[in-house]
A protein has these predicted regions:
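Active-site phosphate/pyrophosphate-binding segments
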Residues: 77-204, 214
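C-terminal functional extensions of proteins
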Residues: 257-259
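Glycine-rich phosphate-binding loops that contact phosphosugars or nucleotide phosphates
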Residues: 1-127, 161, 208-243, 248-254
């Protein structure tokens, strides 16, 4: 959300983990607007952070998947995800729905917004959804790759730059939740600052490479971990791909790739 909003507007965005906000609240100005993101709308830390925000008279928006939840009732504004109930352990539908709502929010906050921009955004999201469906249909290929790179491994690392780094953090969380493999996400440029010492022969590295302006830099990071014997699995896209990349996504608007 921070990356999206700051790229579209002149607004400064600060991100807080709800549990940290609740115990060490930042100094909030009257001009501050607080956005709460919660799948259930019932997370205790988020509820406490909202209580603090309300006590200071600061306006707020809750992005949630559950109509009538505590956060949706006690906030000033609510954006419902309409993603349906999460059945799996990991939140997947709600997460991608949250990203989509944040995209619309970033456009809505622009000083000047053309109607054609919103229409184009809707079209891009619809096209991306169709491409995501194709990936789901081809899940057997993904299963084979997972078996080749991850089965029997103690740990795994995700690397990326820009928005790919953001996705690497969420991807690592998903892998931990579902497989109990120790997984972490790192910014590609930070590998040399200690993290690379954890990489040994056969360590799985999932490299996300969809950001065009940092593509070659991430390729350098891939070579660094390859030199240490890492087993590398690359997800790239048309325009950043190389011949041996395991998954190459189709050409889309770059802001769609986190989905």
């Amino acid at each position: 959300g921070k990356r999206m909003i700051e790229s579209k507007t002149d607004k400064d965005v600060t991100v807080f983990v709800a549990s940290e906000f609740a115990t060490d609240a930042p100094k909030l100005k009257e001009s501050t607007f607080v956005v709460f993101i919660s799948q259930s709308g019932e997370t205790a830390d988020s509820r406490e952070a909202l209580r603090i925000t309300n006590s200071l008279g600061i306006p707020s928006l809750t992005i949630t998947n559950v109509k009538g939840s505590t956060l949706s009732r006690e906030t000033d504004h609510t954006a419902l995800l309409y993603a349906g109930p999460e059945i799996a352990v990991a939140s997947t539908k709600a997460y991608t729905a949250q990203l989509t709502v944040l995209m619309f929010l970033s456009y809505a906050l622009k000083t000047e917004l053309e109607k054609s921009e919103l229409e184009n955004l809707r079209k891009q999201i619809a096209r991306t959804a169709s491409e995501m469906e194709i990936l789901v249909v081809n899940k057997e290929k993904v299963k084979e790759i997972a078996h080749q790179y991850l089965v029997g491994k103690r740990n795994a690392f995700f690397i990326g730059r820009g928005s790919d780094f953001d996705v690497s953090l969420e991807s690592a969380l998903k892998l931990k939740e579902i497989s109990y493999i120790q997984a972490e996400g790192f910014a590609g440029g930070e590998l040399k600052h200690g993290t690379i010492a954890l990489i040994e022969d056969g360590t799985p590295i999932i490299a996300l490479n969809t950001v065009y302006k940092t593509s070659e830099l991430l390729r350098s990071n891939i070579e660094e971990v390859k030199a240490r014997g890492a087993n590398i699995f690359v997800i790239s896209r048309s325009g950043t791909e190389k011949e041996n990349d395991q998954i190459v996504l189709p050409l889309l608007a770059e802001e769609m790739y986190p989905l």
